[in-house]
Amino acid sequence: MSRALLKYIRLSPTKARLVARQVQGMNAEIAIASLEFTPNKAARVISKVIASAVANGGYDAQDVIILSCRVDAGPVLRRFMPRAKGRATPIRKPMAHILVEVGTQKSVQQSVQSTKAKAKGAKNIKSEDSKNSLKVTESKADSKVDAAQKASTTQEKAESKTKVAKAKVATTKSTATRKTTKKKTEGEEK
């Protein structure tokens, strides 16, 4: 597997990603040929980076697959354009970093097989860990039940306190309305 990186290219990363997605997983020779006829600045740049990655690995372009073609955002040049009434509006000139990784079909198949073997080994380790974790989860479940019971009792206490508080508010309102009605009736009698 070899790679090539082109940094600080004056190109919009969003426009370059459209081309990069088309190329990913293709044969390098076919990708370069198709990019030659794509009327896009990003296509010309990405084809050069693919050719560089193939040359870096010392491969023949017919035997190589593009494993990944990634376009990351670089810094943005900020310029200003003068406008009417003394104003200026910003102009963004973005840059991009392009990373291409290529590999032969044989190396790709070997890496896939090795990752499958690693995954099988990890499953065996996980099954042993799951037996131990069952014991831990049982003790955690017991503690959660205790916590839930405590929470329900505290919630019941809080609900009873709110009922008492609401009753007090209701009695104070009724006494206040009685006092105001007494004052009104006394005022009418005078």
From Swiss-Prot:
| Molecular-function GO terms, alphabetical | rRNA binding; structural constituent of ribosome
Q: Its GO CC terms?
A: cytosolic large ribosomal subunit
Q: Which Gene3D superfamilies match?
A: Ribosomal protein L22/L17
Which one GO biological process term can you cite for this protein?
A: translation
Q: Which domain of life is it from?
A: Bacteria
The answer on whether this UniProt entry bears the keyword Ribosomal protein reads yes
* Region Disordered, annotated ranges: 111-190
Point to the regions of Low complexity compositional bias. 167-178
A Pfam family cross-referenced in the UniProt record is Ribosomal_L22
Q: Which CDD domains match?
A: Ribosomal_L22
Stretches of Basic and acidic residues bias are at 125-147
* Keyword annotations of the record: Ribonucleoprotein, Ribosomal protein, RNA-binding, rRNA-binding
**Signal peptide start and end residues:** none
Keyword Cell membrane listed? The answer is no
* Chain's role: This protein binds specifically to 23S rRNA; its binding is stimulated by other ribosomal proteins, e.g. L4, L17, and L20. It is important during the early stages of 50S assembly. It makes multiple contacts with different domains of the 23S rRNA in the assembled 50S subunit and ribosome.
HAMAP family linked: Ribosomal_uL22_B (MF_01331_B)
What family does the entry list? Belongs to the universal ribosomal protein uL22 family.
Q: How does it assemble?
A: Part of the 50S ribosomal subunit.
Q: What is this protein called?
A: Large ribosomal subunit protein uL22
Instruction: Tell me which species this is from.
Output: Helicobacter hepaticus (strain ATCC 51449 / 3B1)
